[in-house]
Amino acid sequence: MTDPSTNMRLKLPITCFILQIILIILFGVLVQYDEDTDAKKHHHGNHSESKSDIENDFYYRYPSFQDVHVMIFVGFGFLMTFLQRYGFSSVGFNFLIAAFSLQWATLMQGFFHGLHEGKIHIGVESMINADFCTGSVLISFGAVLGKTSPVQLLFMAVFEVTLFAVNEFILLTLLGTKDAGGSMTIHTFGAYFGLMVTRILYRPNLDKSKHKNCSVYHSDLFAMIGTLYLWMFWPSFNSAVTEHGDPQHRTAMNTYYSLAACTLSTYAMSSLTAHDGKLDMVHIQNAALAGGVAAGTAGEMMLTPFGSMIVGFLAGIISVLGFKYLTPILENKLKIQDTCGIHNLHGMPGVLGAIVGAVTASLASKEVYGEGLEKVFPDVASGKRTASDQGGVQAISLAVTLGMALFGGLIVGFILKLPIFGAPRDTTCFEDSLYWEVPGEEESHEDQLTTVKTEESDKLNS
């Protein structure tokens, strides 16, 4: 027997149908192909400007888009399968909210960045940017993993995508911030938004589900698959929308070496912080990726290979120390129940990346960049602002992002507390059978789960 408060029989279908119908209508009214996608405009441009089809932006951007897309659906999805009885929900809800978010993000980002004569023009770069926005939502999902219903997650995505687009517009367009790999706009925003949401959704009796908030051997192996996909494709993620040529090449290279250095420091710190010297799979799955996060902002800058290795090395150390010592403090003292430890993988490394970006930007000069200064820092090259000014803008952007994320998460958290969204009880968190049909050997466990009397559950949650 299903708990009526968590029964998705009507709530989920109604939510999905309404949201998708609204999206279809808005796309029909507002969205058009851009010049590289529209048959009439593209061929007219080719004839008048002697362009060849191979110069279409698709051929420059689509390989990176493929890598980013795999990261969003496979990387993030499998990274969260570490919970022993929440694998269906980790991958399945990741799939659901990503599919919705990329559509909504296309509209929100298009409204701020791609609006021409009242229409949103989209191409392959729009798809990449929509995936970036989706990544931020999935980071926040990690903080509330196992404690929210799919309807809650969809509504969280509605609000977060909107706030993401506003924050991105303020940083990239109004302030002229450089953040190609999204250390601030994606990772810092998603992490602190999610942390504030999970703080507002604090569950005092979550320890009643503590026995399910852990991994088993095979669930950690599945999570490691997600880690490897993310690790391999992160250079593409950070470089996907940078300028063609040396900035894109440099971003991929800086990320590549940052990840490698981060991995070694992660293994070292994981062993060092254990009394018996044994490695912790949680550290390896997550902290080894922190180098990619930290290299996001400064990746396209002249960070240098050894500089990127220093950044990755520090990111791995910070991330492991966060998992080992800071996460318990956040839960016990600040009542922040961070299921996936997003503060350690995305939050602190994102802030580190923003700081590195600010310092690196402040050191930019014609002597270092040559004619390439115009590609990376056009305002500095034109004399509109000094390198020190650019560094200050980068620092201000971090403060703006933190403010937007924390305030937005606060408001959205209170909205998601409404009982209409069908959140699970404290006693039934981290459990697939609450929302999924489970096969074979899982059925006996589901039967045991549903025998808990409603009044007993109410008592535990009071």
UniProtKB/Swiss-Prot annotation:
Residues 1-11, 84-94, 147-152, 202-220, 324-344, 417-462 are cytoplasmic. The chain crosses the membrane at residues 12-32, 63-83, 95-115, 126-146, 153-173, 181-201, 221-241, 303-323, 345-365, 396-416. GO terms for biological process: ammonium homeostasis; ammonium transmembrane transport. Glycans are attached at N46. Keywords: Ammonia transport, Cell membrane, Cytoplasmic vesicle, Glycoprotein, Membrane, Transmembrane, Transmembrane helix, Transport. GO terms for cellular component: basolateral plasma membrane; cytoplasmic vesicle membrane; plasma membrane. It is a multi-pass membrane protein. It is found in: Basolateral cell membrane; Cytoplasmic vesicle membrane. The keyword Transmembrane applies. PANTHER family: AMMONIUM TRANSPORTER, AMMONIUM TRANSPORTER RH TYPE B. Functions as an ammonia transporter. May play a role in the elimination of ammonia in the gill. This is Ammonium transporter Rh type B. It comes from Oryzias latipes.
